[in-house]
Amino acid sequence: DDFEIPMQIARQGQRVLLDGRSLVFDELQNDMSGERKRKLRTLGGNFQSFARHPWLFSPRGNPIWLQFLSHKVFRLAVPYAMVCALISSLLSSTGWVQCLAAAQVAFYTAAWMGMRSPTWRKSRLIAFATVFVELNWTAMQAGLQFASGRLDLQWEKT
């Protein structure tokens, strides 16, 4: 609803505003499994809206088309871009690109270490890498599961 209703309002040519006095509550997840479930559900809802409303992708049909693409769609391409960046930099013979490949491998190694051990996650850098990789991995899973019809969109409190 927090996406569907504003998009219908925008489609009618009206402005969508958030009242600065609004109160928004979102409980922090204590564990990654709860966050993963929440992320799968919310991204699944995005994919469901995209499938229901093809006009969202039309520059003529969507008055906020550029904002929609940049805030909703391009973010979903990030996990795939990460995979492409890693593979292409690993295959490159250019020196500076190989340095970027080494940095990417170090980043993913840090994330892997954080996934394996709570002790490692005490480091802010490793914690950041871990959460960044896990959330992007979850975004990729959401897209693949939705495309294959295996994504459970049933709401449950996480």
PLM region spans:
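Membrane-embedded multi-pass helical conduit in multi-pass membrane proteins
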Residues: R75-L151
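Catalytic donor/gating beta->alpha subdomain of glycosyltransferases that bind UDP-sugars
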Residues: D1-F68, W137, Q141-Q145
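Alpha-helical membrane-interface segments at transmembrane helix boundaries
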Residues: S70-F74
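Membrane-proximal intrinsically disordered regions of secretory-pathway and membrane-system proteins
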Residues: R11-G13, Q154-T158
